[in-house]
Regions:
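Alpha-helix/helix-capping structural signal
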Residues: 8-9, 40, 78, 120
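Short, conserved active-site loop motifs that form the nucleotide-linked donor/cofactor pocket
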Residues: 70-71, 133
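Active-site neighborhoods of divalent-metal-dependent phosphate/nucleic-acid chemistry enzymes
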Residues: 72-117
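Alpha-helical structural signal
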Residues: 39, 58, 99-102
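Acidic, PIN/NYN-like endoribonuclease modules and their adjacent C-terminal/linker elements
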Residues: 103, 107-138
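Histidine- and aromatic-rich ligand-binding microenvironments
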Residues: 3-6, 37-38, 95-96, 118, ...
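A general alpha-helix detector
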Residues: 6-10, 44-45, 82
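Short, well-structured N-terminal submotif of metal-dependent ribonuclease cores
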Residues: 1-37, 50-62, 128-132
Length: 138
């Protein structure tokens, strides 16, 4: 098992001024399973780092990836069809590429939980690999 990280908790763990910093940092530091970042999440995190933090925060995150603190999960062939299906099915809910990609990776890796602050979208999405997924932090 692993803990999949969506954009919100990963970014909040880096930004000490973020309202969710303490909870997200604690969640990440307490994790005993591998921490997995879906590759599309890195693009969103980079955007928020460039907007709100010093670029050194991105370099530090990449260093952590390089040293194995985080694993990166790329999308693979069948994931793109699932992303397409999710974007189509939930079009009225403004489910975008990154959220759909995160769920596709959670499903492919058969994970029971997801670290996300996006309760609006992930509370709505229904995974196909289980009845529901646990959203953290609680």
């Amino acid at each position: 098992m692993a803990l999949i990280l969506d954009t919100g908790p990963l970014y909040a763990s880096l930004d000490r001024s973020d309202a969710d910093h303490a909870a997200c940092r604690a969640l990440i530091e307490a994790a005993t399973e591998p921490l997995v970042i879906p590759a599309p999440v890195l693009v969103e995190v980079d955007y928020w780092i460039q907007q709100r933090l010093h670029p050194g925060a991105l370099v530090a995150l990449l260093d952590d990836i390089e040293t194995g603190a985080y694993q990166v999960a790329d999308l693979v062939g069948g994931d793109y069809q699932r992303v397409r299906d999710l974007c189509d099915r939930y079009a009225d809910a403004d489910i975008g590429f990154v959220d759909a990609a995160v769920l596709a990776i959670v499903e492919r890796l058969d994970e029971p939980k997801l670290a996300t602050l996006d309760r609006r979208h992930f509370g709505l999405l229904r995974p196909r690999h289980r009845e529901s997924i646990e959203l953290l932090p609680a």
